[in-house]
């Protein structure tokens, strides 16, 4: 494969020197871009877009044509793994993901297969290979998965949830069943991410979107334990280069020390965590990614620039920072504002890397 022309992102994750702070955006390929909407319309629906390697490749590359981003992330969905387990994923207009066959009983968990990344999830691997080929070494490609806990919330609830009633009922009434499910998911995610790495992903990220819904003790037992298992099982070197691993628990700022002890290379931060405090606590062990509130992108260019400057100043000089939003970019943000954000990070961060 082509030699990497811009390795700022990978270097920052490994706390190595860079010339400017690298930047990318969660959900950077998405509905805020008119070209994405056109490609999705061509695909017909969201999962058809994910399953078409050529179209998934196209939307992955779209933000790079607009902005000088330092990384690109595979266009896919965290629910591809449970879908490949046979739960029947579909999307209800205005309501989000739904599963036709949610997990209700222990026997449902026992019957779950562990998907083969090159068979049931082969369309994802094909997309990774196509993207790497089209990138021609421009920037690194990030692969990703949902964390076992986060995937389990959708599988047990049958879709999105705000109260997490069903999975918390399982957690407190049938913890052995939940552990069995999480263990199967961890094994599946290891295979899935290693498949992405073999196909060409140069870094991987675990999205623990709903870990923050747990108590501290439950987080360690039902979420972090399984992310640790995944980190232990991942390929950490491919094609002679280290493959960095980033963990992101939304609402998990109180658990950074425990997360850093998993052996990951970096932690993602949401905007509720002070990045200066995070660096003091774990900056000698891991890089940090984040953490601007995505809603700042509704502001003027001057307001966006001010927030970027504040976060850069809070992190301070030196290595180990990847600038990002604290969660995904909102679908109604003007693309020009995202462009101002990326440019501001590169321009304002130069003085921190002398």
From Swiss-Prot:
Which Pfam families does its entry note?
Answer: URO-D (PF01208)
Quote the SUPFAM superfamilies the UniProt record gives. Answer: UROD/MetE-like
Protein name, per record: Uroporphyrinogen decarboxylase
User: Which Gene Ontology terms describe the biological processes this protein takes part in?
Assistant: protoporphyrinogen IX biosynthetic process from glutamate
* Biological function: Catalyzes the decarboxylation of four acetate groups of uroporphyrinogen-III to yield coproporphyrinogen-III.
Family the entry assigns: Belongs to the uroporphyrinogen decarboxylase family.
Which UniProt keywords are given for this protein, alphabetically ordered? Cytoplasm, Decarboxylase, Lyase, Porphyrin biosynthesis
Q: Which InterPro entries does the UniProt record give?
A: UROD/MetE-like_sf, Uroporphyrinogen_deCO2ase_HemE, Uroporphyrinogen_deCOase
Instruction: List positions binding substrate.
Output: 27-31, 77, 154, 209, 327
Q: In which pathway does it act?
A: Porphyrin-containing compound metabolism; protoporphyrin-IX biosynthesis; coproporphyrinogen-III from 5-aminolevulinate: step 4/4
Q: Where, subcellularly, is it found?
A: Cytoplasm
Subunit and interaction comment: Homodimer.
Per the record, the gene is hemE
Task: Report the GO molecular function annotations.
Answer: uroporphyrinogen decarboxylase activity
One Gene Ontology cellular component annotation held by this UniProt entry: cytosol
Which coarse location class applies to the principal site listed for this UniProt protein? cytoplasm
Q: Does the keyword Ribosomal protein apply?
A: no
* Keyword Cytoplasm tagged: yes
Name the Enzyme Commission number(s) assigned to this protein. Answer: 4.1.1.37
In chain numbering, the residues marked as site (Transition state stabilizer) are 77
* Gene3D superfamilies registered for this protein in UniProt: 3.20.20.210
Catalytic reactions of this protein: uroporphyrinogen III + 4 H(+) = coproporphyrinogen III + 4 CO2
